[in-house]
Amino acid sequence: MSAIERITKAAHLIDMNDIIREGNPTLRTVAEEVTFPLSDQEIILGEKMMQFLKHSQDPVMAEKMGLRGGVGLAAPQLDISKRIIAVLVPNIVEEGETPQEAYDLEAIMYNPKIVSHSVQDAALGEGEGCLSVDRNVPGYVVRHARVTVDYFDKDGEKHRIKLKGYNSIVVQHEIDHINGIMFYDRINEKDPFAVKDGLLILE
């Protein structure tokens, strides 16, 4: 049974056993574009990927299922070489405040593509992690500070979004996955915490 057949079964909930780890060649393969109309499997896959992210951010479900928290997942991480990503960034609010929306960014993206980006680069101050990497890799992961991304939803409708800050980093990390790139490829090997002119450090 193929990975997509197993994962899209009605009763299946994606867990850490479904996520392949670094060293698997699928993570180094440029994934194939999906064609529209999508197959039922491709639609269900996107929904299950989003469901996994919601479970991973729910303390009760995460503990019950043994999940690491995640804000993004790409189909290649499930050993499915298709250009499908899911991103789920919670709204961080000050103590005592009530968020307007639970999530700052919530999207299942088919064939996402960066169509323009800022000259300025940015990196998370605490570095990045990955559900497919079971080790800490310290260093600044240098990315674009701002990006414009085109993608299609499950109905084949095209969307264009402009992203900055943390949301921009998350989407770039997932788009890297569909291009066979790992986050640590973007860390300066000789000097992991090198700060070049104009690099924006996001705390």
Curated annotation (Swiss-Prot):
Name assigned to this protein: Peptide deformylase
CDD domains, per database record: Pep_deformylase
Chain's role: Removes the formyl group from the N-terminal Met of newly synthesized proteins. Requires at least a dipeptide for an efficient rate of reaction. N-terminal L-methionine is a prerequisite for activity but the enzyme has broad specificity at other positions.
Family: Belongs to the polypeptide deformylase family.
Amino-acid positions noted as binding Fe cation in the UniProt annotation, renumbered to this chain: C130, H173, H177
Known cofactor(s): Fe(2+)
Spans through the membrane: none
NCBIfam families linked: pept_deformyl
Keyword flag Hydrolase: yes
Species of origin: Streptococcus pneumoniae (strain ATCC BAA-255 / R6)
EC number: 3.5.1.88
Active-site residues, as the UniProt record annotates them: E174
Molecular functions per Gene Ontology: metal ion binding; peptide deformylase activity
Keywords per UniProt: Hydrolase, Iron, Metal-binding, Protein biosynthesis
An example Gene Ontology biological process: translation
Catalysed reactions, as listed in the record: N-terminal N-formyl-L-methionyl-[peptide] + H2O = N-terminal L-methionyl-[peptide] + formate
Textual note on the cofactor: Binds 1 Fe(2+) ion.
